[in-house]
Amino acid sequence: MKQTTSAARSEKLDVLFGTPVFAVVIAILCNAMWGSAFPFIKMGYRLFAIETSDTASILCFAGIRFMLGSLLVLAGSVVLEGKLPALPRGKVFAECCALGLWQTCAQYAFYYSAVALLTGAFGGILNSTQSFLGVIFAHFLYGDADRMTPAKALGCVLGFAGVLVGTIGNHGGGSAFGIFAMLLATVIFTLAGPWNKSVTKKADSFAVCFLNLFVGGAALLLIGLAMGGRLGRVTPAGVADLLYLAFICGAGYVIWALLMKNNPVSRIAIFGFVNPVVNVFLSALLNGEPLFRWQYVGALVLVCIGIWLVNKAPAQKEKL
């Protein structure tokens, strides 16, 4: 009876998330949530009284977020599948844990350090390079299955041009180490993509995501604590900020998985341009950062067009 109820629930969700109008609206909202992460992380540092140079406390903050997010992934599995995910065993379990140490721990150790040292606009522009690096890596990794096309190539050129424009005359946008850390986090994210895809073929996707977030988050927290980190000031506003960030990484995964399952990739992925736009506007609204610096506006336009082009290309291929 439980299996029948779970199957019926899953079927209803598939129908709902497969509805074009609903899917587009949710894809925009999902990207808006991810775009809000940078300014909310930065606001979290302020609410918890974490100094930009306090790397240990920054790692503790990141670790708690991802561990909480992993619990939301478990909740998503219960709601959508009617059960907790079956954890893999042996080598696959070890591989999932290793993925967490790489994709969550290593990537976000650099990412969270960069957030402390960069403005939201500049950090978002730098972080957008993951869209273009992913396209380039896919061309060499997957061959004919994901070839570079003229539209993708143009998108990459415009995207990297946007990053260059954003870097020109970097008036207080961020330190050299902040730039390096963000770009390194982007490279780690891009390299983790094919590995993540490979692991999810060997185990339940919810289990893979749970272990990724939990193991990586626990490693960040333990490293931070070992370095003497702590959350200096706990307030209701700070807790709310942390819970929202946990929701983004946990529930965001579940929502995106449903969208990708029930829609053509081209229908959903093109809305990635919403991410940096929301980042810039919320950074101005929540953290008082400048909104209309010419290099940021110009870079944002180029990056958004680039993201749209590299993700629109598959739709053109499907129509042939």
Task: Locate the predicted segments by residue.
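Transmembrane alpha-helices of multi-pass small-molecule transport proteins
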Residues: 2, 47-103, 133-137, 188-192, ...
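Helix-helix packing/entry segments at the starts of transmembrane helices
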Residues: 64, 104, 108, 122-131, ...
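Hydrophobic transmembrane alpha-helices of multi-pass small-molecule transport proteins
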Residues: 73, 137, 148-168, 273, ...
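Specific transmembrane alpha-helical segments of multi-pass solute transporters/efflux pumps
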Residues: 78-123, 127, 163-165, 245-263
